[in-house]
Amino acid sequence: MANANKTAAIQFTRGVDEPVVPDIKLTRSSDGRTGRALFVFDQPEIMAPETWAGITGMFMIDEEGELVTREVNARFVNGKPSALEVTYIWKSEADFERFMRFAKRYAACNGLGYSQN
């Protein structure tokens, strides 16, 4: 269930926070206005057999509202689901800034850091 004390969460089914923290990689266009975030969730709880059919997108929820993407793809190993790969695309500097505000809140909630490669 959603945790009222969290300021940022990721959900694949509305109302159910995903506890598995993803690896996130960002890429931006040369002018910096557009780009994407690639999320990789290894063995997320949403892929359990009892919840598998409930994925409706990825919802990034924080105090400002929510960001949504429907680009959610499953990775299978030996016929069994092993990971989710999710792409979130932004198309303006304002969209990027909004995504980064969510990312900072999400990182703080999950004890994560940020590194630039």
Curated annotation (Swiss-Prot):
Cystine pairings recorded for this chain: none
Gene Ontology BP, a term: photosynthesis
Subunit-level organization: Part of the photosystem II complex.
UniProt KW Nucleotidyltransferase keyword: no
InterPro entries according to UniProt: Psb28_c1_sf, PSII_Psb28_class-1
Lineage, opening ranks: Bacteria, Bacillati, Cyanobacteriota, Cyanophyceae, Synechococcales
Membrane topology: Peripheral membrane protein
Keywords: Membrane, Photosynthesis, Photosystem II, Thylakoid
Main localization category: membrane
Pfam family, one: Psb28
Cell location: Cellular thylakoid membrane
Family: Belongs to the Psb28 family.
Identification of the protein by name: Photosystem II reaction center Psb28 protein
Superkingdom assignment: Bacteria
